[in-house]
């Protein structure tokens, strides 16, 4: 089955729904991301002692990697830039970015995408919080972090056709031409690594389906208000 990848489409089969280019880039950036994250995180705590940040300037994460041209409404992004609440992230053709959130969640945004961080509440002392993002179009891959580890139901992604409720997992969604495809990557309920199983609840006013097996996928068609049903691979 040929489907869309993060950066180029269509080129990959179901088990390579995640862009290999994206994964390799993330591995190379992992150590750098950790250093940047620590500097910005503790720097932001210090800044709070000296100034009051408005909601519009609330820090939610940093840019870990960039491919091509990625912008917000007011600036072109580069590696290491801060990302704030309510900013719209726009990735152009052949472009993409990885965002590392303060709770260590990772958002990978693919080409021709528009993603907004609508809600980000995080207490680093307890790892309590809530994350809500919306995908207007394009691709978003989510690896959940400390907030979801504490409370698996605390991360939601809104799409034009419905809502994706992450339950402490890794998944990808693609919004294109009135349809949303959502893939659960894992870990599944029968994983051999001793990891807590993850799942994604995909739903709207017409119904819902639970993805709880790795590489299970479902589609919502906005024009027909219909579901493709869950498929496992």
Which residues make up each language-model segment?
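Positively charged n-region of N-terminal signal peptides that target proteins for export
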Residues: 27-32
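Aromatic (phenylalanine/tyrosine) cluster motif
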Residues: 7, 16-17, 26, 37
């Amino acid at each position: 089955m040929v489907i869309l990848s993060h950066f180029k489409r269509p080129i990959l089969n179901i088990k390579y729904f995640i862009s290999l280019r994206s994964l390799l880039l993330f591995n190379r950036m992992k150590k750098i991301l950790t250093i940047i994250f620590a500097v910005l995180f503790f720097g932001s705590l210090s800044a709070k002692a000296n100034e009051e940040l408005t909601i519009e300037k609330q820090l939610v994460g940093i840019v870990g990697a960039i491919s091509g041209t990625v912008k917000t409404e007011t600036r072109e992004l580069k590696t290491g830039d801060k990302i704030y609440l309510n900013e719209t992230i726009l990735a152009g053709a052949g472009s993409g970015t990885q965002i590392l959130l303060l709770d260590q969640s990772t958002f990978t945004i693919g080409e021709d995408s528009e993603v907004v961080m609508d809600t980000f509440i995080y207490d680093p002392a307890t790892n309590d919080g809530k994350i809500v993002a919306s995908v207007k179009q394009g691709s978003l891959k989510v690896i959940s972090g400390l907030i979801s580890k504490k409370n698996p139901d605390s991360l939601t992604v809104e799409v034009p056709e419905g809502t994706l409720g992450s339950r402490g997992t890794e998944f990808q969604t693609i919004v294109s031409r009135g349809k949303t495809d959502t893939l659960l990557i894992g870990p599944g309920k029968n994983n051999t690594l001793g990891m807590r199983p993850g799942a994604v609840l995909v739903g709207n006013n017409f119904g819902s389906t639970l993805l709880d097996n790795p590489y299970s996928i479902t589609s919502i068609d906005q024009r027909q208000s219909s579901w493709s049903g869950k498929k496992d691979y």
